[in-house]
């Protein structure tokens, strides 16, 4: 929805590819910003692969939702907001799907306070980052099973994984 909103603000056209299992409220909200929505695949990974194919075929700019350091950096500003509201915070729990949000938040949090503990949280049925974290390398789950569609990812981001390894203290 963020890309759709930004495209609307800048008068750009956006095509957003989402899994067929995406809740209708998210699909409708994305469309309300003027984006074209393509429903494809049963899980995020299939939708992402299709989005990349569309970008290649039509010359679109592909914006990865989590495996993009620029996107993760922007998401990291959440850590600044946390420290502004709670300057003595000792722990931050951050949700993980593909890892972009956790990368941004944990990286900036550790820069602002190297002693802070940042814990990633994933659904048990979609714990691709936890599996990767434990294995020391990006790992693909055979399947995902969660109602939390925003975290239903089989393979976490390759580009952001080193930041996860460096800046997350644990993943539960």
Task: Please tell me what each predicted stretch does.
Residues 1-54, 108, 128-141, 160:
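Active-site-proximal loop->helix
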Residues 4-10, 67-167:
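Glycine-rich phosphate/pyrophosphate-binding loop at beta-loop-alpha junctions
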Residues 12, 35, 58-60, 116, ...:
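A structural micro-motif
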Residues 33, 60-66, 144:
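Short beta-strands and strand-loop turn motifs
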Residues 36, 42-45, 67-68, 149, ...:
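Acidic-enriched, low-complexity/disordered segments with a strong bias for Aspartate over Glutamate
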Residues 52-55, 81-83:
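N-terminal small/polar loop signature for handling phosphorylated ligands or for N-terminal nucleophile
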């Amino acid at each position: 929805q963020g890309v759709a909103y930004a495209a609307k603000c800048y008068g750009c056209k956006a095509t957003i590819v989402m899994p067929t299992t995406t809740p209708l409220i998210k699909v409708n909200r994305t469309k309300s910003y003027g984006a074209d929505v393509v429903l494809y695949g049963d899980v995020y990974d299939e939708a992402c692969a299709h989005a990349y194919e569309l970008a290649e075929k039509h010359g679109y700019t592909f914006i990865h939702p989590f495996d993009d350091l620029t996107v993760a950096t922007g998401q990291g500003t959440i850590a600044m907001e946390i420290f502004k509201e709670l300057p003595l915070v000792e722990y931050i729990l951050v949700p993980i799907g593909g890892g972009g949000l956790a990368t941004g938040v944990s990286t900036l949090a550790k820069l602002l306070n190297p002693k802070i503990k940042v814990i990633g949280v994933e659904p048990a049925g979609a714990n691709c980052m936890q599996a990767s974290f434990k294995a020391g390398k990006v790992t693909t789950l055979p399947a995902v099973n969660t109602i939390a569609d925003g975290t239903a990812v089989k393979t976490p981001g390759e580009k952001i994984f080193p930041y996860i390894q460096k800046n997350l203290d644990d993943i539960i």
